[in-house]
Amino acid sequence: MAAKGAREKIRLVSSAETGHFYTTDKNKRNMPEKMEIKKFDPVVRKHVIYREAKIK
Protein backbone atom coordinates (compact mmCIF):
# COMPACT_ATOMS: atom_id res chain seq x y z
CA MET A 1 0.00 0.00 0.00
CA ALA A 2 1.30 3.45 -0.92
CA ALA A 3 2.14 6.08 1.69
CA LYS A 4 -0.23 8.98 2.25
CA GLY A 5 0.67 11.96 0.04
CA ALA A 6 2.09 15.24 1.30
CA ARG A 7 -0.35 17.34 -0.75
CA GLU A 8 -3.27 18.95 1.05
CA LYS A 9 -6.28 20.71 -0.48
CA ILE A 10 -6.58 24.38 0.42
CA ARG A 11 -8.89 27.29 -0.32
CA LEU A 12 -7.61 30.66 -1.53
CA VAL A 13 -9.93 33.40 -0.20
CA SER A 14 -10.10 36.90 -1.68
CA SER A 15 -8.72 39.74 0.44
CA ALA A 16 -11.38 42.04 -1.07
CA GLU A 17 -13.96 40.38 1.26
CA THR A 18 -16.24 39.45 -1.67
CA GLY A 19 -16.63 35.82 -0.65
CA HIS A 20 -14.98 34.58 -3.85
CA PHE A 21 -12.42 31.78 -3.53
CA TYR A 22 -10.29 29.39 -5.57
CA THR A 23 -9.43 25.83 -4.55
CA THR A 24 -6.03 24.24 -5.09
CA ASP A 25 -3.58 21.96 -3.37
CA LYS A 26 -0.07 22.43 -2.06
CA ASN A 27 2.78 20.32 -0.78
CA LYS A 28 3.04 20.91 2.99
CA ARG A 29 6.64 19.62 3.14
CA ASN A 30 8.00 22.02 0.51
CA MET A 31 5.87 25.02 1.47
CA PRO A 32 4.86 25.00 5.16
CA GLU A 33 4.02 28.74 5.29
CA LYS A 34 0.64 30.16 4.26
CA MET A 35 0.24 30.80 0.55
CA GLU A 36 -0.51 34.29 -0.84
CA ILE A 37 -1.12 34.72 -4.57
CA LYS A 38 -2.35 37.65 -6.63
CA LYS A 39 -5.28 36.46 -8.75
CA PHE A 40 -8.31 37.92 -10.51
CA ASP A 41 -11.48 38.48 -8.47
CA PRO A 42 -14.46 38.52 -10.87
CA VAL A 43 -16.77 40.16 -8.30
CA VAL A 44 -14.72 43.39 -8.09
CA ARG A 45 -13.17 42.79 -11.55
CA LYS A 46 -9.61 43.42 -10.30
CA HIS A 47 -6.51 41.46 -9.36
CA VAL A 48 -6.32 41.10 -5.57
CA ILE A 49 -4.33 39.03 -3.09
CA TYR A 50 -5.79 35.63 -2.24
CA ARG A 51 -4.78 34.09 1.10
CA GLU A 52 -4.80 30.44 2.12
CA ALA A 53 -7.62 29.11 4.29
CA LYS A 54 -8.62 25.58 5.27
CA ILE A 55 -11.38 23.77 3.42
CA LYS A 56 -14.21 23.09 5.85
From Swiss-Prot:
Annotated Gene3D superfamilies: Ribosomal protein L33
GO terms classed as biological process: translation
DNA damage is among the record's keywords: no
PROSITE patterns: RIBOSOMAL_L33
SUPFAM superfamilies: Zn-binding ribosomal proteins (SSF57829)
Keywords: Ribonucleoprotein, Ribosomal protein
Signal sequence bounds: none
Any Pfam family matching the protein: Ribosomal_L33
UniProt GO cellular component terms: cytosolic large ribosomal subunit
Gene Ontology MF terms: structural constituent of ribosome
Keyword Ribosomal protein: yes
Domain of life: Bacteria
Matches recorded under PANTHER family: 54S RIBOSOMAL PROTEIN L39, MITOCHONDRIAL, LARGE RIBOSOMAL SUBUNIT PROTEIN BL33M
Family: Belongs to the bacterial ribosomal protein bL33 family.
Stated name of the protein: Large ribosomal subunit protein bL33
